UniProtKB/Swiss-Prot annotation:
Record gene name: nikE
Assigned protein family: Belongs to the ABC transporter superfamily.
Major localization class: membrane
Membrane topology listed for this record: Peripheral membrane protein
Subunit structure of this chain's protein: The complex is composed of two ATP-binding proteins (NikD and NikE), two transmembrane proteins (NikB and NikC) and a solute-binding protein (NikA).
Name the UniProt record assigns to this protein: Nickel import system ATP-binding protein NikE
InterPro entries with a match to the protein in the record: AAA+_ATPase, ABC_transp_ATP-bind, ABC_transporter-like_ATP-bd, P-loop_NTPase
């Protein structure tokens, strides 16, 4: 379970980015955090990951194996390491896998799943496309076998086909391996395909919280209706 109780956070004392956030996520529930840029979505993810400490309130995670997938993959990779080195480091650090043959077999399996060419493994992060690097970014997190996965705008660098491929892979992972799956996005269509619950943030506060089946209910918050209408065009 993930639980946030009365969490408030600000980068300085004068302005709070998040205010009195209360969220409970039971095991097995996939949650989307929806809102415009600047509403506090990424800050919320950073708090759950333990990168920041709340000014007020408490955050409880029942599982320590939490990993992120961020929007900009280039900053997530060591620029001086090949893609292969970065992927194998995840296998060693998180799973204790030191056998090179076993590492290679896992990489080959995942390359096929993500529809990526093995020749790209010898490249540096700067030598592959943004879409390819983002798929490697997702692959690296899944190779580590986290119990909780937090994805922050992960489809922003992907074309339509690659986006659907990654979504299908993540959906399969939520069935087999993940306790929790949290997706941070401003794209409602992505959330509709990945999660069963949506929490809406506006100006650092939760204004709506509902299951995906309740998305079009008449009692949705006006801001939620505004977002839904914007994505319907």
């Amino acid at each position: 379970m993930i639980e946030l109780k009365h969490v408030t956070f600000g980068y300085n004392k004068k302005q709070m980015v998040l205010q009195d956030i209360n969220i409970t996520i039971p095991d097995g529930e996939n949650v989307g955090i929806l809102g415009e840029s600047g509403c506090g979505k990424s800050t919320l993810a950073s708090l759950v990951l333990g990168l920041f400490k709340p000014v007020k309130g408490e955050i409880y995670l029942s599982d320590n194996a939490v990993l992120p997938i961020f929007q900009h993959p280039l900053t997530s990779f060591n620029p001086d390491w090949t893609i292969e080195t970065s992927l194998k480091e995840a296998l060693y650090y998180y799973r204790g896998l030191t056998d090179n043959t076993a590492q290679d077999q896992l990489l080959i399996q995942h390359l096929s799943t993500f529809e990526l060419n093995a020749q790209l493994l010898t490249k540096l992060p700067s030598e592959v496309s943004g879409g390819q690097l983002q798929r490697f970014n997702v692959m690296r997190s899944l190779l580590a076998q986290p119990r909780v996965l937090i994805c922050d705008e992960i489809t922003s660098n992907l074309d339509v086909i690659a986006e659907q491929n990654v979504i299908n892979i993540l959906k399969a992972q939520t069935i087999t391996n993940l306790n929790h799956f949290i997706v941070i996005s401003h794209d409602l269509s992505v959330l509709q395909r990945l999660v069963n619950r949506i929490i809406v943030l506006k100006d650092g506060m939760i204004v709506d919280d509902f299951t995906i089946e309740e998305l079009f209910n008449v009692d949705r918050h006006p801001y939620t209706k505004e977002l839904v209408q914007a994505f319907s065009y």
